[in-house]
Amino acid sequence: MRFSRFIIGLTSCIAFSVQAANVDEYITQLPAGANLALMVQKVGASAPAIDYHSQQMALPASTQKVITALAALIQLGPDFRFTTTLETKGNVENGVLKGDLVARFGADPTLKRQDIRNMVATLKKSGVNQIDGNVLIDTSIFASHDKAPGWPWNDMTQCFSAPPAAAIVDRNCFSVSLYSAPKPGDMAFIRVASYYPVTMFSQVRTLPRGSAEAQYCELDVVPGDLNRFTLTGCLPQRSEPLPLAFAVQDGASYAGAILKDELKQAGITWSGTLLRQTQVNEPGTVVASKQSAPLHDLLKIMLKKSDNMIADTVFRMIGHARFNVPGTWRAGSDAVRQILRQQAGVDIGNTIIADGSGLSRHNLIAPATMMQVLQYIAQHDNELNFISMLPLAGYDGSLQYRAGLHQAGVDGKVSAKTGSLQGVYNLAGFITTASGQRMAFVQYLSGYAVEPADQRNRRIPLVRFESRLYKDIYQNN
C-alpha cells in the first residue's frame, strides 16, 4: 500500500513538472515580465489537465461577466424583463391629470428615446392634455453612486464606461462634431444635435496642419453638473469635423430633459416642476409602460459583445432583487457571492467582486475559482443554455477575429469570454477537443507590455502564445 501511494505521488509530481515545463515553453512567446495564471480541466473531471499558478489572484476584466450572467440567471431567471413605466395617483378630469406624473425608470439598459416617445403618446391617447402637478423622475430602484469603486477616472466620460444608472436613455451616450477654426490659434467649435439635452463648451485651440505641438496637446473633456461638458486641448486644422462621443454623467437629469421635451412635442403641458424622486414610493396606476427583451437575450448580447452597460445594470438589479433594497454595488457583490455559494455550490472565497462588468481594477479572482464557475455552467447547461451565449471563435462576438485561436485551428471549437484591460488578455470558457472532449479553461494573462517601437505589432507575441497553447490543448486531449 505504501509503495503504491509512493508511485501515485511520484506520478503526480512527474505530471505536474511536465505541465510546468510545457507551460514555460508557451510563456517564452510572451513579452518579458508578463504574468500567466492558467488552468485547463475536462468538464466533470476531479483534477485539472494543466494547473499553472491557478491560485494566483488576477484581474478578471470582462471574464467577470460570466459570473454576473450565472448569478443573474439563478436569481432573476431567463424571462426577467426590465420595466419602465409612467404612473400617477391622480385622476383625469376633462383632459387634466389631477396629480403628479411619475416616470419610474427601472434601469433598462436598452431603453431608447423612441420608447419614451411611445409612452408619452399612450398617455396622450388616454386623454391627458395637461398635468396639474409635477413630473417626477423616479430612480429609487438604485441608490448610491452610479460609478463602481475602482473605475479609472479617465474612462468615466467614455461611452463604454457610461454610468449604469436607474435612468438610461440611448445607452447614456451622445455624439458631437468638433470643427477646427479657419484660422490657427482660434477656438475650435462644437456642434451638438438639438435632441441631445447636453451643453458643450469648447476651449480647444486650433493648430496649423502638421504642427509639432499636436503630439502633446491632447483633447480632453471635463464633465460638470447637469450634463455640461468642457472640451479642452488642441485640434490641428482639418477639412472634416472630428466625430466624438461621450458618456452622460447624470442619467436622471438627461432622462428628465428628454421626457420634458417629448411631453412638449405631444402638446401636454404641466403646471408644476420637473423633480427627481430617489426614495422608494408605492406605485401608482400605470398609464404607459415599456419592457426590455427577456434577460437571456440581454445576457447573450452582454457576453457576445462584452456590453458593460448591460452587465452593470444586471449586477445592481441582482442586489435589488436578492435583498429587496435599492440596487448598489455592495448589494450586488454580496448577492452574487451568496447566490453562487447557496445555489450553485461555488464558494468564491477571497475573490473581490466590485462590479458586474469587470471594468473595476478592484476585482480579483483566481483561475481555480473561475474554473468552479465554468464547471457548474457546463454541468447545468441543459437548463441554463449558457454556453451558446458565449462568443464562438471565428464566428461572432469578441472571438470572431481572435488571431491566435484562428491560427490554432479551433474556429468553431472554442466558446469563451474575453477580458481585456491595459496589459491584460484573458479568456475563460470551453474548447471541444479533437477527440470530442469538452475542456474548460481559464487564461489570466497580465503585465503584458512591449517596447514603444513595437506598439503597432504588440499583439504578435499574444497570437503566437495562444496559437501554440490552444492547438496543443485541442490536439492532445
From Swiss-Prot:
Which residues are recorded as binding substrate?
A: K417
Q: Name one GO molecular function term.
A: serine-type endopeptidase activity
Q: What is one Gene Ontology biological process annotated in the Swiss-Prot or TrEMBL record?
A: response to antibiotic
Q: Which Pfam families match?
A: Peptidase_S13 (PF02113)
- From the UniProt record, list the reaction(s) this protein catalyses: Preferential cleavage: (Ac)2-L-Lys-D-Ala-|-D-Ala. Also transpeptidation of peptidyl-alanyl moieties that are N-acyl substituents of D-alanine
Using the record, list the residue span of the signal peptide; answer none if the entry has no such feature.
1-20
Mind listing the UniProt keywords for this protein, alphabetically? Antibiotic resistance, Cell cycle, Cell division, Cell shape, Cell wall biogenesis/degradation, Hydrolase, Peptidoglycan synthesis, Periplasm, Signal
Superkingdom, natural source:
Bacteria
Tell me which SUPFAM superfamilies the record gives.
Answer: beta-lactamase/transpeptidase-like
Q: Please give the GO cellular component terms listed in this UniProt entry.
A: periplasmic space; plasma membrane
**Which portions of this protein are annotated as coiled-coil regions?**
none
Q: Where is this region: Absent in class-A beta-lactamases?
A: 90-263
Q: Cite the EC number.
A: 3.4.16.4, 3.4.21.-
Q: Which residues form the active site?
A: S62 (acyl-ester intermediate), K65 (proton acceptor), S306
Where found? Periplasm
Pathway as given in its UniProt record: Cell wall biogenesis; peptidoglycan biosynthesis
What's in the misc comment field? In E.coli there are three murein endopeptidases: two are penicillin sensitive (DacB and PbpG), the other (MepA) not.
Q: What family does the entry list?
A: Belongs to the peptidase S13 family.
Query: In UniProt terms, what function does this protein have?
Result: Not involved in transpeptidation but exclusively catalyzes a DD-carboxypeptidase and DD-endopeptidase reaction.
Q: Tell me the protein's name.
A: D-alanyl-D-alanine carboxypeptidase DacB
Source organism: Escherichia coli (strain K12)
Gene name in the database record: dacB
